[in-house]
Amino acid sequence: METHIIKRDGKSEIFSIDKIKNAINKAFIASGTFATEETMAAIISRLRIHDGISVEEIQNQVEVALMAEGYYQVAKNYMIYRYRHTKDRETMDKLDFLMNYCNASNAATGSKYDANANVEKKNIATLIGELPKSNYIRLNRRMLTDRIEKMFGKELADKYMALLKQHFIYKNDETSLANYCASITMYPWLLEGTKAIGGNATPPTNLKSFCGGFINMVFMVSSMLSGACATPEFLMYMNYFIGKEYGNDYYLHADKVVDLSKRQRTIDKVITDCFEQVVYSINQPTGARNFQSVFWNISYYDRYYFESIFGEFRFPDGEKPDWDSLNWLQKRFMKWFNAERLRSVLTFPVETMALLSENGDVKDKEYADFTAEMYAEGHSFFTYLSDNADSLASCCRLRNEITDNGFSYTLGAGGVSTGSKSVLTINLNRTVQYAVRQGMSYLTY
C-alpha cells in the first residue's frame, strides 16, 4: 500500500525514502564526511512514517534521529539546509506573487492577503505595500498570542488561533502594525502646529493656512493609523477662521464679493473653494498608506449636542465658538458635499449627524427637519441619536464614551479624543452554520 505525505502547499504526494536519504547525504557532505549504508539504515530506522504525515514532521524526525545517533554537526548542517530551503521557498512565493499581481485584472484579485483593502488602482506603489503583508500577519499573531498566553494561559491562546484559522472570527488589519482608528482633537495643532507629531509646520493663522495645514495634519496622523482618522471639530475650527477674516456674521452676507481678483469671488465661493480644496485633497491616494487615501470622518451637531460638548470650549485667544455661523456652515457643507458627489466619486469624509433626543424624539426640531431633508435629497450619512451628549459616534464606532476618559485641555477643549487599538469581528454566518451542522443550538454555541 502506498504511503502519502502532505506537502507544505497542502497537496498530497507519494512518499519517497530517496528524497530523505538525499537530504541526509548532503548534510553529511557539508560536515566533511559521508554516511555509510549502516549509518543511513540506523538513522532511517528511527523514523516513524505514516499515511498523511506532513513534510515538516518528517524533517523534524530526521533532526531528532541524527542527534540520537550522535551526529550533532550533521544535524546542525541539516537544520541549516532546511532553513535555506525555507528562505528559497519564501523568495519563490514572493516572485510568484509579483507575477500574479502584475497579471491580475485588478488590485483586489491580485491581493493574496488583504483583498478587502481600500485599493482601487494596481500599480508599483500598491504592489510594494502588498509584499510585506504576510510578515506583518505572522508578527501580529505572534505578539497577540504571546500576550493572551501571558495574561490568560496557553489554552486560550491556542483557542484564539484555532477560531481565527477556522474563520469563526476575523482580526481586522493584521497586515499593519499601526493602531486601528482614532478620533482626535485638533487643539494641540492650534497651539503648536504639527511639531507634537514630528512635523515642522507652525499653527494656522488664517483660513488658507488652516485648510492647507489641516490636510497635512490629517495625512500625518493617518500615516500612523491603519483605519480611520476622525476630526469632530473640523467645521467648528474652520468656522472660527472664517469669522476671523469676514466676521462672525459672515453668513448673513455670504453673497458679498470679497475677492479683488478678476474672479470676484463671494464669501460663499471662498468657503466652497475651501471645501473643495480639503475634500479633494484628502480623497487623493498617498504613498504613506500604500497608494490609498486616508479614511476621514467628521461630525455635525444640533444646537443642544453642540452646547453640551463645546459649551465651555475656548479657542487659544479666549473666543467662544459661534453657534449661529457654525449652524449655517454645517448645512452649507452638507448641501455642497451632496451636490459634489453627483460630479465625482468622493468617499470621504464619512459623516455622522449627532442629535440629542428627549422623550423618544429629537430635541432640536430644526435639525430633525434638516436631517430628514438631507436624506430625502439622497445624501448618505450616519445619524447618531443619544439622550445624553456623553459620547460621540464616528463611522463604525457605535459609541465612544467621552465623559470620564475624554481628552480635555485646561482652556476648555471638548473631550473628543478616543479610538481603538484593533477590531475583532465575529463571523456569525460561519458560527450559525457550524452549530446547525453539529446539531447544536446556535444561540447556545
Question: Which stretches of residues belong to each language-model region?
Answer:
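Charged, amphipathic alpha-helical regulatory modules used
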Residues: 1-107
